[in-house]
Amino acid sequence: MRRRDFVRQSCASLLALHAVQRWPLGWGRVRGQAPWLLIPMDDAQTDHLKAYGVAFRAVKRGTRAEWFLNYRNGAFLLPSESVTAKDAALAGVLTEALEEDQLAQIRGQIQGGNMDAVPLEKPPKVAVYAPPNAPPWDDAVTMALNYAGIDFDKIWDGEVLGQKLRTYDWLHLHHEDFTGQYSKFFLNYAGAPWLVDMVNRNRAMAQSQGFPSVPAEKRAVAVAIANFVERGGFLFAMCTATETLDLALAADGVDIAAAYSDGTPMDPNASAKMKWDRALAFHNAQLELSPTIPVYSDIDGHQVNSPERRQPLGSFTLFNFSAKIDPVATMLVQNHRQVIPDFYGLTTSFTRKTLKPSVTVLAEEPGAPWVKYIHGEHGQGTWTFFGGHDPEDPQHQIGDVPTDLSLHPHSPGYRLILNNVLFPAAKKKELKT
């Protein structure tokens, strides 16, 4: 090779090498590309649910990221790193390139409107409370996390009582009965293999932990979860876990379980003896006394398993909050839809009359005596309750086929779930919510 050709080729190689700017952790951006990527979350987005996974993984890599509250329905801003662009492309998530002047215009728009730019600093370590043999489709949050590609661990009673909760930031509860009554299915589904398995598994766990009954063991688990929140943990619960967690917490020294659970009948005066100061969200509820009706109390507004009291499904509406004053509430309601079709669960909704005054209502069915989505603080941490079981399976009958989220990539109900996963990553500042 001639010296001239060698020099020309060497210079070309050096130029190609220096065309890649190195960002933190070694992720490269090719010179000439726009410096920023916007992940829009309005109707332009091709996969709303997987967009959360792209943002979560970017933050996990140490990438600087921001959540643009109320701008394009909760868009994400990320540096234009090659690994992020590739991740988004493989996930089928739409990104838009931004130049510095375009970003400056967006920031001006955010500053002047009911919007805010919230830095995302550290993704939470996520745990999902579920029995060891729970199928992945039995829990909407598990499905959402798997579909979005967000890492999580499954834990159950042994881990909770063994103090492992201290190693996590965010905990999800779903179709769990913390009153220890097997979802009150014991009499109506006696002999069903899935119920027999549930009963045997819970009785074995209670015995292994040294408790005299499943209700006693489940209440201890509920107290441990409340302590997790009090120490600064983030709790997100759906379906029966919302109502039964508070019932278990308030039932200090009160027998609220049917005889098939602990060998003694429920105290007929239990409602008057509940210690509601121990509960997170609810107070002054009236408990269901019948062991044959799979209903716990009048906390649930829809009473889906009581033929005489069952209410039809409607739609619920998300509230608007001030992004700069109430950033937490604003994060939790980011969505490309404000009105969302309702969906049943064993606990579908929360009656207004049983909400503590400190509760923030995030979504309601206008004119109805119940709300759908609520939030509050407990000690140093926060809790969020979302009624219903699966946003894309409104009736949710036992034995229904699993929901395929690839058919629902724009699900507004599942977006609310993923808002809860991501908001603990937001940079903390003085909040009024």
What are the language-model segments listed below?
Residues R31-D139, G388:
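Hydrophobic targeting/anchoring helices
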Residues L37, D42, T46, F76-K86, ...:
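Helical hinge/lid and interdomain linker segments adjacent to catalytic or ligand-binding clefts
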Residues D5-W27:
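N-terminal export signals
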Residues N227-E230, T242, D246-P291, V295:
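Serine-dependent carboxylesterase/thioesterase catalytic core
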Residues A127-V128, H172-L173, L235-A237, W383-G387:
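Structural recognition of the beta-strand scaffold that forms the well-ordered cores
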Residues R31-P40, L49-L77, D255, T354-T360, ...:
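Extracellular ligand-binding/catalytic regions of CAZymes and related secreted enzymes
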Residues D139, N146, E243, K273-H396:
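Catalytic beta-strand/loop cores that center a nucleophilic Ser/Cys/Thr
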Residues Q111-N114, G158-V160, A368-K372:
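Alpha-helical scaffolding within the catalytic cores
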